[in-house]
Amino acid sequence: MPKYKTSEQVLSLMKDRTRVRNIGIIAHVDHGKTTTSDQLLAASGIISPKVAGEALALDYLSVEQQRGITVKAANVSLYHEVEGKGYVINLIDTPGHVDFSGRVTRSLRVLDGSIVVVDSVEGVMTQTETVLRQSLEERVRPILFVNKVDRLVKELKLGPQEMMQKLMDIIKEVNNLINIYAEPELKEKWAINPTLGNVVFGSAKDRWGFSIPMAQKKGINMKHVIDAYSTTDKTKINELASQVPINEALLDAVIKFVPNPVDAQKYRIPKIWKGDLDNELAKSMLNADPNGPVVMMITDMKVDPHAGLVATGRVFSGTIRPGSEVWLVNAKAPQKVLQVSIYMGQFRELADEIPAGNIAAVLGLERARSGETLIDIRYKDLQGSFEKLHYVSEPVVTIAVEPKNPKDLTKMIDALRKLSIEDPNLVVKINEETGEYLLSGMGFLHVEVSLQLLKDNYGVDVVTTPPIVVYRESVRNKSQVFEGKSPNKHNKFYISVEPLNDKTIELISNGTIKEDMDSKEMAKILRDQADWDYDEAKKIIAIDENVNVLIDATSGVQHLREIMDTMLQGYRLAMREGPLAHEPIRGVKVILHDATIHEDPAHRGPAQIYPAVRNAIFAAMLMSKPTLLEPLQKLDIRVPMEFVGNVTAVLSRKRGKVLNMTQSGSVARILAEIPVSESYELASDLRGSTGGRAFWGTEFSKWAPVPDSILTDVILKIRERKGLPKELPKVEDFLS
């Protein structure tokens, strides 16, 4: 099918919303997600069928092709016919490697269905579970694709009965997860059932795949598969590919089981739209109305060397056209759309307009960032947005970068800025004291890939320090009240600190509790779910990004209102760099009990208020068993039984602990936790000790206290690295 015809067909079909499907492919790393995407593209005539699987059309960054993993979520619109009717399928490829899960979470918001790819031999892995859980939370309907079925014949040498058993086990495991994570009314409706056809078995690499209904129709069964792989001759495999082509099996299932945008938005908008569901914007979105006001959610920002910033996202309501005036809800800024287009592989094809229910690429939104909500400017006073996406992990590894050639400094700064626009999980900071540029990511791989992108895309060669793990400071006990005085002694703050309980930390981290919510609603949630006193919870005046809260327990303090903003800023600055090692503070409740404030504004500026607030908080922290928290990673390791001892030895050398171990057949599955600081050489150690026979996945687990036996050591090392005095701070240092 010639491509020019396709892009015209795609554009005309987009107007009929019942013929549109928005899907993504999600999976654990290396289970064959991008190869699956390629087969779907090849069938649409976007890549030639001969090179699909080699081409990795969606892996268009050279980093991805070298490493063979997908880093960016790429978009493409496909054309597919079922029973003579044409459909548009917007396909979004998402990364399966844990270091990039921020991108997965973002892509899910704009999908209505997902193809979950699982390797037939490895089965359901941690990352499969994480992405499936996230997609069910976003009300995205799953279809299952069990890939690499050829491995059951070639490597495990199973017969037809055993093969079916192995495949049924995977289906059972996926249904188990749907049962745990899907909402009650969707559990049964969305369960995977082979006889209905919402599961496809096949091999993406060899281009064949079938659902049970399709196999019955075409007279194919598992015996044919075993025969095809039992000879060295490829002809039988090619016959399979022409009898049951993978793209037909998957896309037929997508069209049958994934809802169109009109049906999907009815039940997805109430879940993902944070705002009044009765106003005009929400009503128009619930119906995916192309004639309503424009509402679009931006999921991805890319820097195109020729076109500038390209924003990609889904139009939930209205029709977006060049010249549309829109309002960015998060940036609080008006913008004008210059150009709209659809994706075909990595290329953008211009369009005159893109109606609700479709994925669009938009030029002209210089101020937009991933996660932005964009609405018709005439409706900017109607409040509401797609909730702040909560990503699954937070940046835990930092490196300092400087250009190899000092002349490249401005080029590097510009490149870092662009990278952080494209990837919100990458944090770029400047260390004011040393002038270093710090880059923080989700794990060693994330940071490594970002450096490679600097070199490939922006031509900047950088010198880096070894990766540094990020810590947090916290407390373990309740402190007494401390007085913090301003340098001029005219302002005093009386403050105590105590640790937040785990439930509160969880509610803030997952976005249930937010600083800007109604205080009564917040207090009710904290009382019912986290054992707070209702009256105390109502007095929360700040929650910062590192999960600390500030409570104003004062009554009738004169002039406090007037300096409130300055005091809050002082609190936030203190929370960014704690007393032990200048690392961010996490999980602390700060209570302001009383204050004395000078009546003359000249004597109560930031230079007086900041140190007073900070000193009281730091003194209180040092008296309440302060500690460092380190990031832990969850490991999910599959390894033959005979290597279990070697794996546990590697883990215990790295301060890891085994949480659970199960066995199926001759393979053990070990769930463990290990500090990120110890995981640097983990890959080579695990491979070395198991002769390369261990598969594993990692994922951010939680922050946990550094063991007391090494605490002082760790603190002193960080202080030395930051050029701070070698001795630990004392309470007296902060009391004047």
UniProtKB/Swiss-Prot annotation:
It comes from the Archaea. The modification Diphthamide is found at residue 603. Its main location: cytoplasm. GO terms for molecular function: GTP binding; GTPase activity; translation elongation factor activity. GTP binds at residues 27-34, 93-97, 147-150. Keywords: Cytoplasm, Elongation factor, GTP-binding, Nucleotide-binding, Protein biosynthesis. InterPro entries: EFG_II, EFG_III/V, EFG_V-like, EFTu-like_2, G_TR_CS, P-loop_NTPase, Ribosomal_Su5_D2-typ_SF, Ribsml_uS5_D2-typ_fold_subgr. NCBIfam families: aEF-2, small_GTP. This is Elongation factor 2. The lineage of its organism: Archaea, Thermoproteota, Thermoprotei, Sulfolobales, Sulfolobaceae.
